[in-house]
């Protein structure tokens, strides 16, 4: 690291934002190809490119923060603001889905039969798998808080145990959601109910997968002693994101599964 007279991180040119954008284009185009032409080739290419980008970008950030010491308190403050703004943007993103749902359900049109759920739709029982999913995510919220407090107290083993439990619960939630989709008596093409249900819960499921990936990276970093009790923003950001995913699910459960059924 060359001598510098300021606390800011002057980032080196990186190809990963470009490859990340290209992978996003390939994945969204691949999703359309899969839906309309039953071909997964483009989607698989997009997912592969995305995984490679994630690995290499995370590797660079770990190198800059842990080994080169670029993440000074000033830089960490900027990263905190960035993560907060990112979560706010995600809140607005999900607000759009809730808006679509309530716009359709509070005043059902004659085309829907003037009722909600629309005529012919058999909604899922909110007291079965959705309630179990709620319990799983609430438990994961407790375990991630346990992990955070263990890290701040310097208790490495408890932190690893709690983080592993959180990851396991996240994976379990994803499997439950997949089984629910498989057994659902309606599809994404079943009018406004199907589209709002699958888009809202599907994007939440995607965020659970992203959050689980974030936590898995933190787990391996903790195994390599990357975090200390006062320098662990990578884990803190993952914990914030996980709590956000928890809260969104509670709104989804109350709105779409319970009230909407």
Swiss-Prot record:
Name of the protein in its database record: Cytochrome c oxidase subunit 3
EC code: 7.1.1.9
PANTHER family assigned: CYTOCHROME C OXIDASE SUBUNIT 3 (PTHR11403:SF7), CYTOCHROME C OXIDASE SUBUNIT III (PTHR11403)
CDD domains in the cross-refs: Cyt_c_Oxidase_III
Reactions accelerated catalytically: 4 Fe(II)-[cytochrome c] + O2 + 8 H(+)(in) = 4 Fe(III)-[cytochrome c] + 2 H2O + 4 H(+)(out)
Mitochondrial matrix side: 1-15, 67-72, 153-155, 224-232
GO molecular function terms noted in the UniProt entry: cytochrome-c oxidase activity
Organism listed in the record: Cephalophorus natalensis
Keywords from the UniProt entry: Membrane, Mitochondrion, Mitochondrion inner membrane, Translocase, Transmembrane, Transmembrane helix
Protein function: Component of the cytochrome c oxidase, the last enzyme in the mitochondrial electron transport chain which drives oxidative phosphorylation. The respiratory chain contains 3 multisubunit complexes succinate dehydrogenase (complex II, CII), ubiquinol-cytochrome c oxidoreductase (cytochrome b-c1 complex, complex III, CIII) and cytochrome c oxidase (complex IV, CIV), that cooperate to transfer electrons derived from NADH and succinate to molecular oxygen, creating an electrochemical gradient over the inner membrane that drives transmembrane transport and the ATP synthase.
Subunit annotation: Component of the cytochrome c oxidase (complex IV, CIV), a multisubunit enzyme composed of 14 subunits. The complex is composed of a catalytic core of 3 subunits MT-CO1, MT-CO2 and MT-CO3, encoded in the mitochondrial DNA, and 11 supernumerary subunits COX4I, COX5A, COX5B, COX6A, COX6B, COX6C, COX7A, COX7B, COX7C, COX8 and NDUFA4, which are encoded in the nuclear genome.
GO annotation, cellular component aspect: mitochondrial inner membrane; respiratory chain complex IV
Top-level taxon: Eukaryota
């Amino acid at each position: 690291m060359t001598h510098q007279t300021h606390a800011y991180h002057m980032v080196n040119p990186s190809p990963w934002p470009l490859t990340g954008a290209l992978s996003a284009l390939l994945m969204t185009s691949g999703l359309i190809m899969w839906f309309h032409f039953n071909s997964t080739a483009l989607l698989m290419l997009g997912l592969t490119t995305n995984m490679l980008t994630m690995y290499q970008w995370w590797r660079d950030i770990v190198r800059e923060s842990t080994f080169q010491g670029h993440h000074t308190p000033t830089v960490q403050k900027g990263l905190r603001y960035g993560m907060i703004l990112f979560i706010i943007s995600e809140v607005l993103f999900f607000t759009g889905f809730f808006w679509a749902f309530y716009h359709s359900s509070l005043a059902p049109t004659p085309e829907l039969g003037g009722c909600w759920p629309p005529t012919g739709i058999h909604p899922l029982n909110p007291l079965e798998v959705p309630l179990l999913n709620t319990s799983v995510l609430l438990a994961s919220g407790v375990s991630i808080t346990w992990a955070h407090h263990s890290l701040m107290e310097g208790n490495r083993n408890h932190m690893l145990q709690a983080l592993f439990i959180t990851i396991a619960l996240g994976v379990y939630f994803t499997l439950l959601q997949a089984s629910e989709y498989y057994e659902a008596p309606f599809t994404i093409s079943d009018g406004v109910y199907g589209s709002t249900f699958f888009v809202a819960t599907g994007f939440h499921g995607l965020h659970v997968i992203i959050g689980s990936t974030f936590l898995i990276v933190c787990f391996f970093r903790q195994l390599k002693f990357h975090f200390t009790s006062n320098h662990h923003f990578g884990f803190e950001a993952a914990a914030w994101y996980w709590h956000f995913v928890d809260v969104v699910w509670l709104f989804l459960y109350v709105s779409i599964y319970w009230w909407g059924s």
